[in-house]
Amino acid sequence: MTTAQILETARHTPVWHVWVCAAGVSTAAGQGASGPHGDRDDRRAALLSRLEATLGGRREPVRSTGVGGTPVLEAPGLGIVQRCPTCGRDGHGAPRLTAPGVRAQTLPPISFAHVGGSRPGTVLAWLDVHAEDWAVGVDVEDVRARRVRRAFTPGPDGAADIDAVAFSAAERAGLERGAAAGQDPVTARARLWCAKEALVKAAGTGFLADPSAVDVAASDVRLVPLGPDVLPDGWVGALALRPLTPPGRS
């Protein structure tokens, strides 16, 4: 798996990018982002600045031919708006890009994830497609973080404190089988949790009920596990790609 992974679909092939801004992370040009590491707003701003520079050098493809037409960004000023699809209020919900003189639907879908604790960082995921075509969600966890280990470490009965609320009976059974096969139980739970978070981020809703009700096998969503080739050592994550256009529409 690479930082820009082509995912084959029946309609088109969205290419995803995951950029990380965190202390001690060194990524190749075009495959990551560097910048301030202490404050999540600063990290997010650094990632947006990198994305603005990337989009500023691209040209919007003409859909009928696929040949580049007008620039994706004709002027600087890339920003973010959030509106909750459930309550209709601003300030939360899935982030969407804005830019001067550009229809939001022509900009790429994005998603952010933040890691706190002693190794803080921010992750930006974005797609090489229009926002009207796909939604993306990303989530990451640091399995070395005390908070994560406290939540996901099984007790003497084999269950972690969060299991009953976070995972369905079938998922808990799968975790037990994985532990019996030698999988690290904290990492396995963190990966599954990230998949659920990524799904609800791609939906733009957050958790509307217990996380155990979120089915990671949803048929219209593609889940991509994120590992050490993309993330800092000790982090795990997941990317969710949700198509927004009906089959047959280009």
Language model: regions and residue ranges:
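Core catalytic alpha/beta fold that binds nucleotide/phospho-ligands
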Residues: 1-250
